[in-house]
């Protein structure tokens, strides 16, 4: 009964003086929220959707709205939908355009027709030396990419011809069919959503509109990159077609291993061997760094594994300021192939130190290792 129906303005959440744009906006928001395809097996949502759709059918039609404003529900009939109810969502009804938008939002796509298509994003794998990664470099690379066919201008059609409007979707890129109460759209299989079909393909690109080519680019690698860093070169990917923008090129960095240095964040690590005599008595040694050799003092009694820090000798901060440090790890070398005199001196040292070097209890080399570690 008409008396049981809610006020149509209340259903859509608008005031009685709302403009057509406000009514359409309110309906679109509610239709997306309560659409049965978005709320499967939800009877309450389905009833809500029917209610807001009924309200919109009346309020979006100037003549019906005027009758409703004057006579209420009785002025538009108690039956709700006119002309057969839910079936009429195609062209020529107030639902034609708006339902196309709604289905596009719900199903994640809209008819593409002849709109431009963006070019592909590309990736180039670049290998750098440790030093290039640390201090930056400028590298020239050869990049294969897709570009518009010069013969057909990217249309895919043989020169002198044009793509034809798809006879299946009539250029919309999508076809619409009835599913129960609702009109559902899907991508046209005949034209793959393009809205046009090529009857006479270009022989150069075989109808794709694109050809393969190679371009030379100069890439400025900033200081401080590491394995896994990706540099983005905007617009240097594949070319777009039909006015679409170019894709981007991503340069993926891989850094080769260094024979001396390793890296932790922005710090550089290296191991420096010293003899057990140098470690015991102290000395001054030369240490390799990314900037060249520097002198470093080893204090007497230095143990194997001790770490010395050379500040500011690490890797520069990527897109920032300052540098990390270099960590020098001391490795005390155990002597081997001792001659008789060297052995005697070490044994004498052990006796003076009160150490037992009897071979049955502990080997000589074990004692030396205990001494220097």
Swiss-Prot record:
<feature type="binding site">
    <location>
        <position position="205"/>
    </location>
    <ligand>
        <name>Zn(2+) 1</name>
    </ligand>
</feature>
<keyword id="KW-0863">Zinc-finger</keyword>
<dbReference type="InterPro" id="IPR001305">
    <property type="entry name" value="HSP_DnaJ_Cys-rich_dom"/>
</dbReference>
<dbReference type="GO" id="GO:0006260">
    <property type="term" value="P:DNA replication"/>
</dbReference>
<feature type="repeat" description="CXXCXGXG motif">
    <location>
        <begin position="149"/>
        <end position="156"/>
    </location>
</feature>
<keyword id="KW-0235">DNA replication</keyword>
<keyword id="KW-0677">Repeat</keyword>
<dbReference type="InterPro" id="IPR001623">
    <property type="entry name" value="DnaJ_domain"/>
</dbReference>
<keyword id="KW-0862">Zinc</keyword>
<feature type="binding site">
    <location>
        <position position="191"/>
    </location>
    <ligand>
        <name>Zn(2+) 2</name>
    </ligand>
</feature>
<keyword id="KW-0963">Cytoplasm</keyword>
<dbReference type="GO" id="GO:0008270">
    <property type="term" value="F:zinc ion binding"/>
</dbReference>
<feature type="repeat" description="CXXCXGXG motif">
    <location>
        <begin position="202"/>
        <end position="209"/>
    </location>
</feature>
<dbReference type="InterPro" id="IPR036869">
    <property type="entry name" value="J_dom_sf"/>
</dbReference>
<dbReference type="InterPro" id="IPR012724">
    <property type="entry name" value="DnaJ"/>
</dbReference>
<comment type="similarity">
    <text>Belongs to the DnaJ family.</text>
</comment>
<feature type="binding site">
    <location>
        <position position="152"/>
    </location>
    <ligand>
        <name>Zn(2+) 1</name>
    </ligand>
</feature>
<keyword id="KW-0479">Metal-binding</keyword>
<dbReference type="InterPro" id="IPR002939">
    <property type="entry name" value="DnaJ_C"/>
</dbReference>
<comment type="subunit">
    <text>Homodimer.</text>
</comment>
<dbReference type="InterPro" id="IPR018253">
    <property type="entry name" value="DnaJ_domain_CS"/>
</dbReference>
<feature type="repeat" description="CXXCXGXG motif">
    <location>
        <begin position="166"/>
        <end position="173"/>
    </location>
</feature>
<dbReference type="GO" id="GO:0009408">
    <property type="term" value="P:response to heat"/>
</dbReference>
<feature type="binding site">
    <location>
        <position position="149"/>
    </location>
    <ligand>
        <name>Zn(2+) 1</name>
    </ligand>
</feature>
<dbReference type="Pfam" id="PF00226">
    <property type="entry name" value="DnaJ"/>
</dbReference>
<dbReference type="GO" id="GO:0051085">
    <property type="term" value="P:chaperone cofactor-dependent protein refolding"/>
</dbReference>
<feature type="binding site">
    <location>
        <position position="202"/>
    </location>
    <ligand>
        <name>Zn(2+) 1</name>
    </ligand>
</feature>
<keyword id="KW-0346">Stress response</keyword>
<feature type="binding site">
    <location>
        <position position="169"/>
    </location>
    <ligand>
        <name>Zn(2+) 2</name>
    </ligand>
</feature>
<feature type="binding site">
    <location>
        <position position="166"/>
    </location>
    <ligand>
        <name>Zn(2+) 2</name>
    </ligand>
</feature>
<dbReference type="GO" id="GO:0051082">
    <property type="term" value="F:unfolded protein binding"/>
</dbReference>
<comment type="function">
    <text>Participates actively in the response to hyperosmotic and heat shock by preventing the aggregation of stress-denatured proteins and by disaggregating proteins, also in an autonomous, DnaK-independent fashion. Unfolded proteins bind initially to DnaJ; upon interaction with the DnaJ-bound protein, DnaK hydrolyzes its bound ATP, resulting in the formation of a stable complex. GrpE releases ADP from DnaK; ATP binding to DnaK triggers the release of the substrate protein, thus completing the reaction cycle.</text>
</comment>
<feature type="binding site">
    <location>
        <position position="188"/>
    </location>
    <ligand>
        <name>Zn(2+) 2</name>
    </ligand>
</feature>
<feature type="zinc finger region" description="CR-type">
    <location>
        <begin position="136"/>
        <end position="214"/>
    </location>
</feature>
<dbReference type="GO" id="GO:0005737">
    <property type="term" value="C:cytoplasm"/>
</dbReference>
<dbReference type="Pfam" id="PF01556">
    <property type="entry name" value="DnaJ_C"/>
</dbReference>
<keyword id="KW-0143">Chaperone</keyword>
<feature type="domain" description="J">
    <location>
        <begin position="7"/>
        <end position="72"/>
    </location>
</feature>
<dbReference type="GO" id="GO:0031072">
    <property type="term" value="F:heat shock protein binding"/>
</dbReference>
<dbReference type="InterPro" id="IPR036410">
    <property type="entry name" value="HSP_DnaJ_Cys-rich_dom_sf"/>
</dbReference>
<protein>
    <recommendedName>
        <fullName>Chaperone protein DnaJ</fullName>
    </recommendedName>
</protein>
<dbReference type="GO" id="GO:0005524">
    <property type="term" value="F:ATP binding"/>
</dbReference>
